[in-house]
Amino acid sequence: MSAEVIPMEPKKRIGNQEPTRSVILPYEYSLGKEAIEIYEKSKRKAFDWQKFLIDAILALNGEGLWTHMAFGFSVPRQNGKNEVTAIRELYGLNKGERILHTAHRTTTSAAAFNRLLAILEESGLEEGEDFHKIK
């Protein structure tokens, strides 16, 4: 007698995928979609809540200036918070911005640096040819 194979249903996300509280100022448009497209070239996939945050972080007003000069978020018990920062940093690097990532511990900033290098390499870019690292 053979065992019957029962296909499993894909797991559905449990809980609200949007913040329970947020203060996002009105804006004209966002560069978030472009940032996500750059990020997803690395074969990584952004979650909906990450896209929501990136849209707000990269929001511009009618004059083309950043809507939010500072942006903070608290997402307790959720994986992927550091990836939001990586998405923003990756976007900035692609636009010629200089990125300074600080942290309380050297190991934390080194981990962020290595994560960003991995994303660049997973995107098909080569160190020395497409980008230069300064450590």
Model-assigned labels for residue ranges:
Residues 2-135:
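Phosphate/NTP-binding elements of NTP-utilizing enzymes
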